[in-house]
Structures are given as C-alpha cells and as structure tokens.
Design a protein with these regions (language model features):
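Multi-pass membrane glycosyltransferase architecture that uses lipid-linked
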Residues: 1-221, 268-426
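Extracytosolic (periplasmic/ER-lumenal) interhelical loops and adjacent juxtamembrane/interface segments
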Residues: 39, 43-44, 52, 56, ...
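N-terminal leader/capping segments at the start of a protein or of a new domain
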Residues: 222-226
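Extended ligand-binding clefts on enzyme/binding-domain cores
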Residues: 227-235, 268
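Juxtamembrane membrane-water interface segments that cap and precede transmembrane helices
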Residues: 65-75, 246-267
C-alpha cells in the first residue's frame, strides 16, 4: 500500500503538468467540445429552468454531479473550475490505479510504469482531457473495480450504479462484476449487489424522472436512436468507399443530440450491423471471463476488454470516449499490456491530428484516411485484450480424453500392483 501511494504521489505532479500542456488545458482560457453546453445546463437549472422538462438534456442525470459544482465560482470562472474538477478526478484515478495494482500484487516497476503512463495521458488525449466530463465516469469505474478486488461487493455495485447514471457505458461491466462476485461469494451476494446498483441509479434519476418522466425518457431514447456517427468504425468504411468513388456519403448535422451522422439506407444498415457487432464483442468478453482460472487477477483485463469492445464497434463514437479506456488499459500487464498501451496511445495521438480540422473531416477530405486507421487501431486493441483473456480460460477436457486418461491411469495402477505382488512373492 505504501509503495502504491508513493508512486501516486510521484505521478500526480507529472499529471497536473501534463494537463496544462494541451490547448484548452489546465490554466488555459480556451475551451473545446461540450464544456459550454455543460455550463448552459447548469446555469439554466439555477435560473429555474428544470432539466429534461424545460430544457432538453442529452446527458444522463448523473452528469449534473459535475456540471453544477463549478457554478459556485461564478459564470466567469466556470471554465477554470470545471477543468480543475476534471483534473481532480484524474488525480483520484491515479491513486485508485495504484491501489488496484497493489491489490493484485504488482511489482514496483509495473506500478510506477502504470501510474506514469496514466500521468502522461493528457498529452495524448489533448484538449478533450479536461473539456469533457468523461473523467468522472472513468473514475467511478476504477473505484468500483478497486472495491470489488477489496471484496466490498455491495459498495462496488453501488458505485457502478452511480457510474451508469452518469454515462451508460459502465452497463457492460455489470455482468463481469456479477461473475466475479458469484464465483467468490455466491448468488445471494450478487442479488444484494444488483439491488444496491439499482437503488443508487434510481436515487440519482428519480428526482428528475419525478417531474419530467417524458423528458428523461426522451433523453435516453434520443441517444439510443442516434444514427451512424461520422467517426464510428462503420462510418469510416463508408467514407473510404466515398473517397474511392464507390459510394456517395452524405453528412448531416443532427439536432437535439449534437453530432454529425451519415444518412441514407446504407448508413442505416451499417448502423444496425454495428449494434450487432458491438453486442457480440461485449458478450464474447463476458463468456471468456466466466471461464478464466483466476477471476480476481483477470478482472481488470476483462473490464478493459469490455469497454474496448463497446467503443470499437459502436455506431456513435466521440474522441472523448477514449478517456474511459486509458485508466483500464494501463492495468493490463505483460506483453498484452505493452501492446494495449501502444495501440491506445497511437489511437489517441492520431485523433489529435484532425482535432482542429473537423471541418475537413465533415467535408470528407484527407482526415478520412486517418479516421479509418484510428478505428482499426481500436479494433486491434480489442483483439489484443480478448486474446489475452482467452489464454486464461479454464480448459475443460473432452469426455473422450477424460476416459482415455482414466483408462491409462487404471492400467498403470494394475501394472504397479502386479510388480509389487511379484516382488513380495519372490
């Protein structure tokens, strides 16, 4: 534990320094992505306009836990206060990553390497590192992971419920948590944990749903029914065909939920296929994890693989989603961990090349090629993590092999008995 905390103390100043480097970083006035939207939601709430009833909100209710606190510093300081809050989430995540590795008995070298890489991640994430609220659910997922490893199962499920209320993606981690707790503590503990998850999520959502049930439903529905977002894997293949003159891509700006989607029958079909692939990718991780020899040691790997599958094949992709992956990927050890970190870093850096040239991407120009490479890197990341997970599954011998081994064992025992009898009669 002391080694873990020392590693975190060393990494935190590095992290804060890295947060100040990108455009829109810590101590910088510029802001990007959706930060102005967060401020608008928070200020309208304080002015008496209720979210989901008077104002359409595209984010889950749990997001207001980080939208509202920066308003305490005034409208003119919301930008700096929000970035500071996200930096604090990052600091807490570094501490938790160190504690997770300490729980797993990681070596000092691996521990320092993991927190060091996490500390440098704002350089690769760029402006999105502090200008979106994704550091909040990312922190909660690592906290839940640590609690599960500490056998604080009910608290772990409760934190997952809070994470789901802030961003829906942690739902893919729930079956993994159920498998882990079931194999260690039995189904009753799983039931209690799931009850805690539902209770926490309900406590967060209920106040909003009480006065605006239709608005909350519309917020979730609008997200679920989004089309093929331009940065998704499926869209990148259609954009490639467009560049080759084999397809006429049409990019449209969506209302309500801000974004740029591809429109048309082909795009709709690819979006449907993406949902199927995403479900299969995540379910594959669940099945493989259910068969691992050591569920405790492999839980961080399974968390990383499930989130990677969710992101790689989704029909809606935004670059800030990669912030969910970083603290989980650095927990993966061995050769797979090195490969996973390298692929994640490459995907992050590549996305920064066109970050300030999104207009060119929406006009279907040169960033299309880089987009395809980035998306394929994420597919490769998923493959690496699933490959590592599959190598740790329980090997169940077939009945024929079992019978053959049993027969050989009986034959060996018979010959041993004969040999001993001959020796005694002599």
């Amino acid at each position: 534990m002391r080694v873990a905390l020392r590693a975190a103390v060393v990494a935190i100043p590095v992290f804060l320094g890295a947060c100040a480097v990108p455009d829109g970083g810590l101590f910088r006035a510029a802001r990007f992505r959706d930060l102005h939207i967060y401020q608008g939601y928070a200020e309208k709430l304080l002015d008496g306009s209720l979210p989901y009833r008077d104002v359409f909100v595209e984010y889950p209710p749990g997001a207001f836990a980080v939208f509202l606190p920066p308003t305490a510093f005034g409208a003119g300081h919301y930008n700096a206060a929000f970035k500071t809050l996200m930096a604090l989430c990052g600091v807490a995540t570094i501490v938790l990553v160190a504690l997770v590795l300490a729980e797993l008995g990681a070596s000092r070298r691996r521990l320092y390497a993991a927190v060091g890489l996490l500390a440098l991640s704002p350089l690769a994430l760029g402006p999105i590192s502090l200008n979106t609220y994704d550091a909040w659910p990312a922190l909660l997922t690592v906290l839940a992971l640590w609690l599960f490893l500490r056998e604080r199962d009910v608290l772990g499920f409760g934190v997952l419920g809070l994470a789901i209320s802030a961003k829906v993606y942690p739902l893919v981690l729930v079956p993994l948590a159920c498998v882990f707790v079931w194999r260690r503590a039995g189904p009753r503990r799983v039931g209690v944990g799931l009850a805690a998850l539902v209770l926490v999520a309900a406590v967060v959502v209920a106040p909003f749903a009480a006065y605006a049930p239709h608005g909350v439903f519309e917020s979730f529905r609008s997200q679920a029914e989004r089309g093929l977002q331009v940065e998704s894997l499926g869209a990148s293949f259609l954009l490639l065909l467009d560049r080759l003159g084999l397809y006429d891509a049409q990019v449209v700006r969506t209302t309500g939920v801000a974004g740029r989607n591809l429109t048309g029958g082909a795009a709709d079909s690819v979006a449907a296929v993406s949902l199927v692939l995403e479900a299969l990718a995540v379910a594959t991780v669940w099945i493989l994890y259910a068969r691992v020899r050591d569920p405790r040691a492999r839980l961080p790997l399974a968390f990383a693989a499930a989130v990677a599958g969710f992101i790689a094949f989704t029909k809606v992709f935004s670059p800030q989603y990669l912030a969910w992956l970083v603290p989980l990927v650095v927990l993966v050890g061995g050769t797979a961990g090195i490969a996973a970190v390298s692929l994640t870093a490459a995907a992050l850096v590549l996305a920064q090349v066109w970050f300030f040239h999104y207009g060119a991407l929406f006009r279907l120009e040169w960033p299309v090629w880089l987009l395809l490479v980035r998306d394929l890197l994420l597919v490769a990341l998923y493959a690496v993590l699933v490959g590592a997970l599959s190598r740790w599954k329980i090997r169940i011998p077939s009945r024929s092999k079992t019978s053959r081994h049993s027969g050989l064992r009986r034959s060996q025992e018979s010959w041993t008995a004969v040999g001993k009898g001959a020796s005694r009669s002599a």
